[in-house]
Amino acid sequence: MKFLDEAKVYIKSGDGGGGSVSFRREKFIEFGGPDGGDGGRGGDVWVEAVNGLNTLIDFRYQQHFKATIGTHGMGRNRTGANGSDVTLKVPVGTQIFEEDQETLICDLTVEGQRYCLAHGGNGGFGNAHFKTSTNQAPDWANPGLPGEEKTIWLHLKLIADAGLVGLPNAGKSTFLASVTRARPKIANYPFTTLHPNLGVATIDEREFILADIPGLIEGAHEGVGIGDRFLGHVERTRVLLHLISAQEEKVGKAYKTVKHELEAYGNELTDKAEIVALSQIDVLDDAELKKKTKELAKACGKTPFQISAVTGKGMTEVLRALRDIIVEANTEEKPAKVPKLRHRDMVVTDEGEDKGGDEGDDQP
């Protein structure tokens, strides 16, 4: 499946149906009173986070979403039917922005979380509403109110526990493939990975999600190479695993290059817990390995792990270190209170279903 992490979408909620002008007509009743019903409410446009999606590719082929209009009221005080809602299904981790791409509308981080992006127009009053003591036969009704329309942007930030960062060909995809069932493309040339990949790692019967993003190079924050646009997918992680290839001539410089790009990107990425590992050590002899490990330790200020996805050396130790940080972070974080029902704009339920919003607001 192709990966797409942003999409531009036009949405429009349904117009409200018009009220009816009608009078009671029965045998032997010459002057029946008004009995025009109200118009139905227009359908809403919702967005919902669902499980099983990790791309916005569907929105490349459909960018317009319109809810149906409410039907007009009818005689005998019959209210028109409400319009049908439209729901945009998006991956968990999707953020919705206004057209300016700066104003955040909502951030969907929980499966089943829903948000009303555009409210349907209220139906108009029928003439039965306008009967008074001085006007027993009103011959007018209200039209329905128009729905809302806007253009929005969808931005996906994948939900993962740990993120893999490093220069191109640092062994990130090989690491992911060796500890999870993910099958990213692996080849001996730069930028083999062109989009993020996710995998579930298991260590000591505990699972966590790993995210592998395309490699960073010097100047990525200025658009060099693939740039830093995919760094958003590790913003939500608990810890970063920084891999430096043992094949780099200057491993200390390689570490600092990526670190500088993380600082230039911002969004507190450099404040995250970090594990540093010298990868692909199977290509070095003992003397060279010792030399490069010492150089990398000096650059990062800590003793790096030594790993090889080919031989399996050091892999278990790194996974356990990642697990410990993730478990500690999850323990320290206060459990979020997920309400079963919130205001009309946002609804979250245990089953991921909308249990309804405000009632009694079908009229203007």
UniProtKB/Swiss-Prot annotation:
GO cellular component, one term: cytoplasm
Cofactor or coenzyme needed: Mg(2+)
Positions bound to Mg(2+): S173, T193
EC number of this enzyme: 3.6.5.-
GO molecular-function terms, A-Z: GTP binding; GTPase activity; magnesium ion binding
Cellular localisation: Cytoplasm
GO biological process per UniProt: ribosome biogenesis
Record-annotated OBG-type G domain positions: 160-327
Disulfide bridge partners, by residue number: none
SUPFAM superfamilies, A to Z: Obg GTP-binding protein N-terminal domain (SSF82051), P-loop containing nucleoside triphosphate hydrolases (SSF52540)
Region annotated Disordered, chain positions: 333-364
Enzyme class: hydrolase
Domain of life: Bacteria
Positions of GTP binding: 166-173, 191-195, 212-215, 279-282, 308-310
Boundaries of every Obg domain copy: 1-159
UniProt keyword list: Cytoplasm, GTP-binding, Hydrolase, Magnesium, Metal-binding, Nucleotide-binding
PANTHER family: DEVELOPMENTALLY REGULATED GTP-BINDING PROTEIN-RELATED, MITOCHONDRIAL RIBOSOME-ASSOCIATED GTPASE 2
NCBIfam families in alphabetical order: Obg_CgtA, PRK12297.1, PRK12299.1, small_GTP
Homology family: Belongs to the TRAFAC class OBG-HflX-like GTPase superfamily. OBG GTPase family.
Subunit details: Monomer.
Job of this protein: An essential GTPase which binds GTP, GDP and possibly (p)ppGpp with moderate affinity, with high nucleotide exchange rates and a fairly low GTP hydrolysis rate. Plays a role in control of the cell cycle, stress response, ribosome biogenesis and in those bacteria that undergo differentiation, in morphogenesis control.
Protein name: GTPase Obg
